[in-house]
Amino acid sequence: ADFYRSVAGQYDEPAATIHFRAEGLHEYTALAFIPGARPFDLFDADRKGRIKLYVKRVFITDEAELLPRYLRFVRGIVDTADLPLNVSREMIQDSPLLGAIKKGLTNRILSELPKLAQQDAGAFATIWENFGAVIKEGLYEDFERRAQLPDLARFRTTASGEGWRSLKDYAAALKENQTAIYYIVGDDAGRIANSPQLEGFRARGIEVLLLSDPVDGFWV
């Protein structure tokens, strides 16, 4: 926990830890933490990820942008021996290694989160509560992973109460002959949940997704 706090600059406990070593053409070791609490500046337009880059255990920079913006809440370190110790900022940005690290680290995080959702639904629900609105930015920013990200997404619905529903959950509960996913978008979750527009759907027992995050108007 102390190491996490020194890396993340936070005082909570990590909600999840991801540790792996990549070998082959590009070799590096990565240790990533998903914080247990939401940083106060999570939605700051200028906020960037803070993955610390090390070369042979020597700190180089925390501005290499090793994750996409929608994973900017993740904290951690990457250590590699495949760069020189005197590497310049320009060399870092132009290095094929950095692109490989970004792709590998992003893919690993996005593959570990569904496993966590299966193994510990409560822990994943907390992560989604804190960071779901940011992760959903990837639904319209990350074309490469647009087929993967919807499986991560969780939603409030007219049937979920205070809980979260996945699209898989929603599909499993479709009414007979229902072929569409219904949703309502607005600025306030409570207001759209009580919208008169939903009365007909409730009367027919049709579940509706309640989309109230700022990003929802962009990706639906």
Residue ranges of each PLM-predicted region?
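Conserved GHKL (Bergerat-fold) ATPase module
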Residues: 1-220
